[in-house]
Amino acid sequence: MKTLIELFDESPILNVLASVAFKPEKLIFFGADPLQVEESRGDYNRFFKSRGESPEIEYISADMENIDEVNDTLAKIISENPDCVVDVTGGKDIALLAAGMAAVKLGVPLIAYNRRTKKYANISKYEHAMRANIFGLLDCEDFF
């Protein structure tokens, strides 16, 4: 993996955890609004510099209330960075949805941190589970 696409989260630790583990050459923070970018850019640069690391960092925004724009933007990022992985440990719900759709449609690997095992897992290997048809198996009465 040369490029890590990090779904930008409010929690700084979730934004750097995969980078610390995998040390990508390029880190793309996806989903941060411009104000978040300006507030955090220096912090992340200082963090990586303090660790002796210098990944190329990009911040790419999209309208996080428009699924078509989020999908199109993420698909463009993936096409421009074919050797990429998407970390879905954090991020906004709409970005997580778009990442899942990209995993199925474009074959991009998804990773997520498992707090119980303290390891990252490639969750895109479970494609059959993502396509499972659960309709008809449960109804509202099962929960009451």
Regions found by a protein language model. Name each.
Residues 88-97:
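Ordered, amphipathic secondary-structure segments that act as subunit-interaction surfaces
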Residues 1-84, 97-144:
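Long, low-complexity, Lys/Arg-enriched
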